[in-house]
Amino acid sequence: MFVRKPATERPRLPSVGRLGLFDPHAPAHLDQLGWNTDDHVELLWSLSRAPDADAALLAMVRLADELKDDWDELNRLLLTDRPLRGRLFAVLGSSLALGDHLVAHPQSWRLLHGDVRLPSARELRETFDDAARSVDIERGASAAIPPLRDLYRDRLLVLAALDVASTVENEPVLPFVTVSAHLSDLADAALSAALIVATRTVCGDLDPRLAVIAMGKCGARELNYVSDVDVIFVGEDIEKDGRSDNLATATRVAGEMMRFAGDAFFEVDAALRPEGKRGQLVRTLDSHVAYYRRWAKTWEFQALLKARPAAGDPELGQAYIDALMPMVWTACEREDFVPEVQAMRRRVEELVPADVRSREIKLGTGGLRDVEFAVQLLQLVHGRTDESLHVASTVDALAALGEGGYVGRDDAANMTASYEFLRLLEHRLQLQRLKRTHMLPDDNDDEAYRWLARAAHIRPDGTHDAQGVLREELKRQSLRVSRLHAKLFYQPLLESVGHTALGIGEGMSAEAAERQLAALGYERPQSALAHLAALTGATGRKGRIQQILLPTLLDWLSDTPDPDAGLLAYRRLSDEHSDLRWFLGTLRDEGAVAKRLMRVLGTSAYIPELLMRAPEVIQMYADGPSGPKLLEDDRESRARALVASASRYADPVRAIAAARTLRRRELARIASADVLGMLDVIDVCKSLTAVWVAVLQAALDVVIRANTPDSGVPARIAVIGMGRLGGGELGYGSDADVMFVCEPNSGVEESVAVRWSVGVAEQVRALLGTPSADPPLEVDTGLRPEGRSGPLVRTLASYDAYYSQWAQPWEIQALLRAHRVAGDLELGERFLLMADKIRYPEGGVSASAVQEIRRIKARVDAERLPRGADPNTHTKLGRGGLADIEWTVQLLQLRYAHKVPALHNTSTLEALNAIGAAELVAEGDVELLREAWLTATRARNALVLVRGKPTDQLPGPGRQLNAVALAAGWGSDDGGEFLDNYLRVTRRAKAVVRKIFGG
């Protein structure tokens, strides 16, 4: 039998949960509005689509309370009028600030009803001007603030409602350029109204000739919802009745205008004027022209790209544009154009704290400033010869660059899309509270991301909810901007050298390519183009990978002190090693490796030569599980590996060749880690010392093995390190100062043992000193007793006898840094015990010896500095340089080591620590000496890294000094700042040196 089941019908009225209403008061709010019947289902679903439905509902409750009897009219319209519903719910769910405005001015909802359109620029200006003129100025300028502020907020309300309506209902989407242009028109109207009020306040009926030039985003007609409006004022100095006071009056008007606009509309910023905030607020046109011709910096011409008359005297405003814009298009010819552009880019990057960089839409990596900077630079470079680039807005400029072949059309379109997406998010973030911000929500704030996604009309995609889609899109867009940022500059350059497989169109001319490379920091653009042609001209896989790699590599190179040298080095490496299958693949697949390699190549002449013969070190530029691979393994294990590699060969020449191979690799590793900021200077010096010690040990072992007679080894030999080798503080350009000590084995005559040991020592020196393509391995024995005229090798007893009877003060001083480094350890240890009696005698060295040391130091200061050297910047022998610090420390050791055992130390830095701990010198003075030693050592090492050969003299201002600054770990390649710091530090240290040596 068929039984009919009772009908079950799901209620049509959605629950608050299904509507996305989370406020516990939401049910009561709906009841209060009467939105709780089946007639309201469609309205409720519209409400649910608001970016923040709870905020929209609460604002509606407050609005209903304020409307009182007029609420019924709005309530009735909301049931049937979809456009009104979309505009109202969307704007209330997007902007708490505009919700407050609407509640305070409840009748303003009518602005959103009916056929709503955006007024033209002329209509806006007429409306605002009329409002400004209708104010009773006798009551003071403040009387004009409320009506004009309300008018401005009403116009913002209408624009915002139209802008976000499509998030709620099927309303037309306002293009970003339309929104930004209207905001700029609104700002122009507000500036005009503020100028009228200010003029009436200051001058009454008189009208001083004053033009307001919009700059920045307002000037480009791409303004944000909330932004300072950048302006420049131009006045005219008119003589009247023998007096010239128009400019003073105009200045008072300009100041009053800025104050009034700040109270009624937005902050007006005139800091882009000549001389910035220190300059005159209002200048004549002639004064502006004179300033820009003589004093203006590159960034000031870049700012003029956006200049546009916005308010005030239109003829004067246009005259300003006509006079100054031609200068903009010749700015790239200025001598300091490239360094100033690079400095601007660095400043922008430094503005953003590292902990919020990933949240910064504007200034973060892959953000809006990256796009704007790239576009403006390309305009400055090519606008001199192409008037189609004389446009102000970023979007228009991108289109013009694409049309002109300076940027690939697809790249221009993609960059525009990314730019507009990021600007849309910026607009939504500002709209919420009408506050100036460019900061994305905190990563953990899911609710804020959910709101932002809905306000930006981002919907779930089946895999992610709306906020998940937004997060993924942000990553994608940021990566795309970073990638396109490089392509904008360099991809068309590659096509200009004849490779059209990139699908960019016809590309730019060779002349345009040279201009662009010059603007990006290449001093030899023709050579750079030749390198690009060679790199991309390779056939098959190599050429294709180079075409993919080069835009990004060139972008990274442009941030280095010497991109020309870097590109040449990269070409040489590619020519030599591109047949290694891993070489190009690693650069393509591991961005960290490629970026680090470009920094190294564009900074150092020393490292590329090593990489040519040790390319495997490039693979160490990658990151391993525990950090950079360049830092994997310790010094001791690497030293053991070097000695072991040499020990595999009986032939000394082949053994030394094996040792050189590992030394080359190790030098490339240390130097790379140094330039990349992974090692501090103390670690660098210790690592370089460990390499030298291992080479000496390997050479000594193999030579002894090759020269051992059938009767056995005639003598034990130890190598004593002197100078910086003994102190464990070698630099890249340091020789190895050593002494050889021997002791006959049992049954061997001393003369035979010494003769054999001399042969070993001479062969070690000869093998290591053989010329090669690697950095030299000079073994210097000049610090032995009697200097170069003394025996090359002595027995321990001979050393003891000589030092006890004949040692000169300088020889005692030299022993302060003696340390066993290779050979027989027990013999080396006994040598040091013997040396201790000489260098740390009971009661200290004699007063006459101290006096002799002081005399020698004075002679060194006067005579040893090379001819033509600058004593202020010679890192070794100059004022407050290494010699000054080391001699000072050694003098204190000679005087006090018998009292302070901690001074029995061959390291300058460790001895300085002991001097401070023993309070032999004031701690402040010790710190000055320590800082000077570290500064000079960094500089001296950096000189070798940059120039590729040992040198002690800092260069003058220019590329090389900038590179030295970067290689020395200064933090930027600002050579001027680095040099100022060097001079300051060494000057202070020299004062301490004089105090100690004089006392």
From Swiss-Prot:
| Catalytic activity annotation | [glutamine synthetase]-O(4)-(5'-adenylyl)-L-tyrosine + phosphate = [glutamine synthetase]-L-tyrosine + ADP; [glutamine synthetase]-L-tyrosine + ATP = [glutamine synthetase]-O(4)-(5'-adenylyl)-L-tyrosine + diphosphate
One Gene Ontology cellular component annotation held by this UniProt entry? cytosol
Which InterPro entries does the record cross-reference, listed alphabetically?
GlnE, GlnE_rpt_dom, NT_sf, PII_UdlTrfase/GS_AdlTrfase
* Biological process terms in GO annotation: regulation of glutamine family amino acid metabolic process
Residue ranges for the region (Adenylyl removase) are: 1-493
Q: Does the keyword Magnesium apply?
A: yes
Among the Pfam families in the record, one is GlnE
What is this protein called in UniProt?
Answer: Bifunctional glutamine synthetase adenylyltransferase/adenylyl-removing enzyme
Q: Which organism is it from?
A: Mycolicibacterium smegmatis (strain ATCC 700084 / mc(2)155) (Mycobacterium smegmatis)
